Amino acid sequence: MAKTRVQDYVEKFSDQPIRFTPYALKKTGLVQSQVFLKIEDYMLICAPFQLSMKRGIFLVVLSAQEITFFQQFQKKLCSINLTFQKTGTKKPLNLFLRGTIERIGPVKGKQNVCMMDASLKGCPNDLVEILGDYITAFEGLKSQYGNFSGKAIPVDDAAAKLMRFNNYVELILGTTKARATLTALAVNSLSLRLSGTPPGLAEGEPCSAKLYFQVYQFTASGRVSALQRGEGDQVLVTMAIEFTPELIEIVDDFFFRQSIQGKAKSAAGK
């Protein structure tokens, strides 16, 4: 008998957590403001941190005294309410989970933030599909990252329009932000042009770039891999960037749209 998609996901991904970055929140449709953890008579508003089919880690704003108070509920039963709103669907999906609080403690370096670790007593099929679909798609992005690495796209007006780029990017060096022009991009690198040299700009230095597209606004982190003087006071910066799922989607979509355009032109020329 053929396995169902749910059975396949449970076998492959039951212990694999996803971390709720802005990208994961958008793709899964989890409504961040509608995550609640109930312990006995206490209902806590949580920020999701990690979730698998067996375990969830949630962040709660609590004082030191409140954290000490709630630690008495370790190994006690709890319930979790999650709400998902997928793109294109009008009705939200509300899920109710039961579990056990395994650990409660302060988050190091974060004042008044508590981490609550809960083991789940079961995972609804809807949640299995949401997590499984996301993990499967994310693994596909990792494969595309390898395929597209080094394939730089010169960002002229036509390319910017095709990739739906809003022509706005900021280079971030520590606390310094500098407006830049994006001249080329790949899944593993960005080429930027700046007017002037902002403080801290040097080869090998960690940096990030915030990019604005119609589909996503996101930050790509990495290091300055090369610097070159341009005309006047202009500086040309090459960034080696880390795996950034939003950018991989944009590059993949660009090459797809480009191929469609090419086929349309070929057909028109016949």
Label each PLM-derived region with a short phrase.
Residues 1-270:
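Structured alpha-helical
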